[in-house]
Structure formats: C-alpha cells, structure tokens
Amino acid sequence: MEPRFLLMADVAEQLNVSASQVYHMVRSGELPAIKIGGRGQWRIERSKLEEYIERKYAETAEWVRTNPLVEKDDPDLS
C-alpha cells in the first residue's frame, strides 16, 4: 500500500520540478498541504496531488481550446 502523504521532495520528483517550486505552490495555496511535527514539515496528501494534476490538465485543455495554434506560431508546421 502506498503512503497517504508525500514529502515535498517526492512531489517535486513526480512533477519534475524543484522542491522550492513545490514549496511555492503550497505557500500560495495552489497545492493543499499540511504542516506536521515539531519542525513543521510539510506533507501533501496523495489524493490532493492527483486533484492538482487533474486541475492542471483541465486548465491546459481550456487554454488550448481558447488559444488555437496558428501555423505561423509553430515553425514545425511551416
């Protein structure tokens, strides 16, 4: 069974970003997390990470829908 909570480093690895980027997402409220222990270590619930990823897919799909690719924008299509 996979752990319910992930370390920020684990989330950074899964998203292929830096730990500082994950910290910024948490502190900005973009990615829900909890602070636990005496040293206040951050933990991200696996389900919250999955919800975040799904939300990003939806946002990207909306952006693609409202910003159609024009041939002159992509040199590979010329």
What is each PLM-predicted segment?
Residues 15-42:
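Major-groove DNA-recognition helix of helix-turn-helix-type DNA-binding domains
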